């Protein structure tokens, strides 16, 4: 299916979006009509010109030309030329700027004027303007908090395969690679692939999946041709950006068709190289088209497509005991699935304890379950921009559409296949305000859980009970009982041989069609009665061998079935409806720069019961917030005070207040040095999954803690051991409800210690952070220095705990009667394997804090060579003894060093860049696996050449060119090398 076919099939404005904004649209269109009919003809001033480098005389593409104090303007083309009209009579001033160059101003005095501008290379990058730190333009030097930035010039020179990959070279930034197409960005610790503590805003829209509550990297984000700027705020920012702006925010802003018109195209190809996967080609291509029809109307469209092969995950170490091999009867390989299904053979078949122990089914390697490891991403972006007057009022209608395949590692490894997400936005904005509303709508497509794919492929061949019965019969030697007269001699293996017993159970030797009359008679006479069966009746198949027609048929059936008892597909059509607004009183109030704003959001969870407990229809809940900020300068504009206050309320929780206060002071005659200090609080609401998930993940059942969720969730029937049935009213099965995990469970640590105790924890509530930060920025000629240090103190930190729920009995042993019972029923349940692990969502009472620092130096050496180095330190403290069942999951190296070296013009039109990243070892904790991650050094490099006559940039590069494979978390595929060549026209 082509991307454009998908667009035709799936592109629509959801009817629910129409219901929400139809009144706004009617009023807005009326306003537009009135404004249009009431508009007058303004005088037009035509301006043309060129922008060149002062040192080399080379044209500068992508330079920003704006009317000072307004958003009207344009950018230079590949040859440094520009032309635009301004509905304003002279005189007025133009500002010309670009990252890496000192901005300049030019006075326009005539109605038809041509100008020539030269830009000097900036001594440092500290004069660059950012918006995200305070929601208002300000120099990086004066920003009240730490901020990182990237724009088109740095995208051109990045040594990484994509601009998004290049974010890893910024100081303080961690990029955890889930797969080739899914990179998870984080700052300041507590990283996961499901990074709900880090926000990503694309043109003001939260790019998170409604069901997952986190973004999938740039899988469904922005094409690099359309990127104008990327800004990253490390740390808490809840005071301005609300819930979940907890660890940081990434802002991606696209180019305006008013300022960046024309057609741009890129093509990229190369190989990914990995020991497990070999060498595989990838392709990446895109086009951006933008046209300014008039001073009032402009439009753009961009498309990009990437296809490649994922990194193969081939870690076959035993999950619980890494030293054990497949010879272990209870083997559970990390990247092998289906072997999680295991039973205590002694309890089930009433053999003496220690005779057979626990045995697992034979699993399948992940490489056989990922349908070719296809990595794919297709993105489209359409926007209409209308400026009804010659002022700065602008109306934007924007649609972003993405479709892709990737792999996500959560509690299990999920093949995100044919995932589709769309966002539609209507925005009205001006110099001092914006109002926007958007909808995020997703479709899980053909996504499935690889673990349950394996489990149910096994079950489609032979049921669990039949497989374990066959293993027992072979291992115990029951088939070789002399009473059967040796009729099973030709098929039964020698007893006590685990490998032979497993092979016997994987076969279909006891299928009725495979038996002769003597064997079938023996089974009916001796084995069936002993097992409580009325007769022997088997229609099993042998284990399906990967690559066989039987395996393919079973795989296709299981991955298209959304019932986890028989399939592995998960469905999702969840949505987010969001509106937010901001108004800056800067032009109306002289005393200070004051702005106010607010937001409202509604979640509509719709997984048809495959992820959430939405069995009877979508689950809906809302949250809203409002904020105010004041900024004031004192002492000859050297001292800047910023104070912010925000209130947020989520439907299921009490409201939260988030204050932020910061002070910065500029030193030196040219204000080129700046000291800053800030205090702020942040909070994070429990995610949709924290509250409403109801999912059997194989190793554990995940149940969210919303009160109405606890009673909705119920397990499939669970088999009770023969011994346990006397405590379960004689019933052979039991169903557990979600509430049991929170009210009648054992803590895992107590069971592991041999002293089972009832777990004790509360329902999940918002977590909070109090953050302190100090920093110093300075420019010394061609050298810039940026240092910061922070300390974060957390309260009610949200996390998971694993508890064990007994099939019968009370976990506090209150039902124990010593005179009639040998032991408490719940304790007997533990001894017989009659329990189920649950993962619950709660808050830790432990004291948790983190602290760290970053230092970055950038300068010019040997003339025009750029050199940069930065160091990041990160550490956390957690009182594990106060909460032994809690895993904090800091998942961040204590030390990181990053170095860059390059030159954009080594000789005429030739440039290069090299990035080196070193990361210390660290411990990774997650619901999938806990393990150490080794230290690593990664080298990326690129060489580029510009051909002005063709308006083209050619690049050749490589990522991890050292070739030593590594991973950022255990369980994922090891990252090999990636080599590429690219051709960009009109970048």
Q: Where would I find each of the regions flagged by the language model?
A:
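Short acidic/polar hinge/loop motifs at secondary-structure boundaries
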Residues: 83-85, 206-236
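N-terminal periplasmic accessory domains that precede
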Residues: 114-118, 163-166, 183-189, 198-203, ...
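Predominantly transmembrane beta-strands of Gram-negative outer membrane beta-barrel pores used
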Residues: 199-201, 229, 233, 249-255, ...
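Outer-membrane beta-barrel signature, preferentially recognizing the C-terminal barrel domain
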Residues: 681-794, 841-852, 858-860, 892-894
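Short, acidic, small-residue-rich periplasmic hinge/interaction motif at the N-terminus
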Residues: 52-56, 61-68, 93-102, 109-156
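Conserved C-terminal beta-signal and adjacent last beta-strands/turns
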Residues: 290-296, 304-306, 375-377, 420-424, ...
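Gram-negative outer-membrane beta-barrel transporters
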Residues: 633-637, 784, 788-923, 984-986
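Extracytoplasmic beta-strand/coil segments of soluble accessory domains associated
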Residues: 85, 147, 164-209, 228-229
């Amino acid at each position: 299916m082509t991307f454009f076919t998908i667009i035709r099939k799936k592109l629509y404005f959801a009817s629910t979006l129409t219901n929400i904004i139809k009144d706004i649209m009617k009023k807005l269109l009326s306003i537009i009509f009135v404004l249009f009919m009431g508009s007058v003809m303004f005088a037009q001033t035509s301006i043309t010109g060129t922008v060149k480098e002062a040192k080399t005389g080379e044209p500068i593409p992508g330079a920003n030309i704006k009317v000072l104090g307004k958003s009207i303007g344009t950018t230079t083309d590949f040859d440094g030329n520009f032309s635009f009209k301004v509905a304003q009579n002279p005189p007025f001033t133009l500002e010309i700027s670009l990252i890496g160059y000192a901005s300049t101003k030019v006075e326009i005095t005539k109605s038809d004027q041509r100008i020539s501008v030269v830009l000097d290379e900036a001594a440092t990058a500290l004069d660059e303007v950012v918006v995200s730190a305070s929601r208002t333009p300000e120099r990086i030097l004066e920003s009240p908090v730490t901020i990182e930035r990237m724009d088109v010039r740095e995208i051109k020179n990045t040594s990484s395969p994509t601009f998004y990959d290049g974010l890893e070279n910024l100081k303080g930034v961690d990029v955890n690679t889930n797969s080739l197409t899914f990179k998870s960005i984080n700052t300041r610790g507590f990283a996961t692939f499901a990074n709900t503590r880090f926000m990503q805003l694309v043109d003001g829209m939260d790019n998170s999946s409604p069901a997952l509550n986190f973004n999938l990297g740039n899988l469904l984000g922005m094409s690099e041709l359309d990127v104008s700027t990327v800004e990253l705020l490390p740390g808490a920012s809840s005071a301005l950006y609300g819930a979940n702006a907890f660890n940081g925010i990434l802002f991606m802003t696209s180019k305006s068709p008013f300022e960046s018109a024309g057609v741009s195209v890129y093509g990229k190809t190369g190989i990914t190289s990995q020991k497990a996967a070999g060498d595989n080609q990838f392709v990446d291509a895109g086009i951006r088209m933008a046209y300014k029809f008039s001073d009032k109307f402009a439009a753009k469209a961009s498309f990009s497509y990437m296809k490649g092969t994922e990194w193969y995950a081939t870690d076959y170490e035993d999950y619980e005991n890494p030293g054990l091999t497949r010879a272990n009867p209870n083997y559970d390989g990390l990247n092998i699935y289906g072997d999680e299904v295991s039973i205590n053979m002694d309890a089930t078949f009433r053999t003496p304890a220690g005779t057979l122990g626990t045995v697992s089914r034979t699993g399948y390697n992940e490489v056989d379950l990922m349908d070719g490891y296809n990595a794919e991403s297709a993105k489209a972006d359409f926007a209409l921009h209308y400026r009804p007057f010659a002022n700065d009022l602008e109306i934007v209608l924007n649609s972003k559409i993405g479709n892709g395949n990737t792999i996500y590692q959560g509690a299990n490894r999920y093949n995100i296949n044919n995932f589709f997400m769309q966002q539609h936005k209507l925005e009205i904005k001006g110099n001092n305000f914006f109002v926007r509303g958007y909808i995020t709508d997703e479709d899980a497509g053909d996504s499935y859980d690889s673990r349950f794919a394996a489990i149910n492929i096994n079950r489609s061949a032979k049921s669990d009970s039949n497989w374990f019965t066959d293993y027992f019969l072979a291992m115990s030697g029951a088939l070789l009982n002399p009473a059967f007269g040796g009729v099973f001699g030709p098929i039964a293996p020698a007893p006590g041989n685990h490998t032979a017993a497993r092979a016997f159970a994987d076969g279909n030797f006891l299928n009725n069609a495979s038996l002769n009359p003597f064997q079938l008679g023996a089974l009916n006479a001796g084995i069936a009665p002993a097992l409580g069966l009325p007769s022997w009746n088997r229609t099993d198949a042998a284990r399906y061998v990967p690559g066989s027609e039987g395996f393919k048929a079973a795989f296709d059936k299981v991955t298209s079935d959304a019932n986890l008892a028989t399939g592995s597909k998960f469905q999702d059509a969840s949505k987010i409806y969001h509106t937010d607004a901001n108004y800056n009183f800067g032009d109306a109030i002289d005393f200070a720069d004051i702005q106010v704003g607010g937001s409202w959001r509604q979640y509509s969870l719709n997984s048809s019961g495959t992820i959430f407990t939405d069995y009877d229809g979508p689950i809906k809940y809302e949250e809203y917030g409002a904020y105010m900020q004041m900024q004031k300068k004192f002492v000859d504009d050297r001292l800047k005070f910023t104070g912010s206050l925000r209130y947020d309320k989520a439907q299921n929780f009490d409201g939260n207040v988030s204050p932020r206060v910061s002070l910065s002071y500029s030193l030196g005659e040219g204000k080129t040095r700046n000291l800053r200090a800030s205090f702020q609080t942040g909070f994070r609401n429990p995610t949709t999954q924290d509250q409403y998930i109801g999912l059997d993940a194989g190793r554990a059942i995940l149940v969210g803690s919303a009160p109405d969720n606890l009673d909705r969730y119920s397990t499939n029937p669970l088999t009770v051991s023969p011994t346990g049935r006397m405590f379960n009213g004689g019933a052979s099965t039991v169903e557990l409800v979600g509430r049991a995990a929170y009210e009648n469970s054992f803590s895992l640590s107590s069971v592991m210690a041999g002293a089972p105790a009832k777990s004790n924890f509360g329902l999940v509530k918002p977590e909070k952070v109090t953050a302190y930060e100090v920093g110093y920025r300075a420019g010394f000629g061609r050298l810039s220095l940026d240092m910061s240090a922070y300390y974060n103190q957390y309260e009610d930190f949200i996390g998971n705990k694993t508890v064990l729920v007994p099939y019968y009995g009370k976990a506090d042993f209150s039902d124990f009667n010593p005179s009639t019972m040998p032991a408490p029923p719940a304790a007997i349940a533990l001894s017989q394997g009659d329990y189920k692990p649950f993962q619950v969502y709660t808050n830790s009472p432990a004291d948790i804090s983190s602290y760290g620092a970053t230092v970055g130096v950038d300068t010019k050496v040997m003339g025009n060579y750029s050199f940069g180095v930065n160091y990041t330190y990160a550490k956390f403290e957690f009182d594990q003894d106060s909460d032994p069942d809690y895993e904090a999951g800091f998942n961040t190296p204590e030390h990181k060093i990053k170095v860059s070296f390059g030159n954009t013009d080594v000789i005429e039109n030739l440039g290069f860049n090299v990035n080196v990243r070193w990361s210390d070892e660290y411990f990774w904790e997650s619901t999938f696996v806990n393990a150490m991650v080794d230290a690593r050094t990664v080298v990326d490099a690129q060489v580029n050449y510009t051909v002005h006559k063709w308006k083209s940039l050619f690049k050749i590069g490589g990522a991890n060119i050292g070739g030593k494979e590594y991973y950022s978390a255990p369980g994922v595929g090891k990252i090999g090398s990636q080599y590429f060549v690219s051709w960009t026209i009109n970048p």
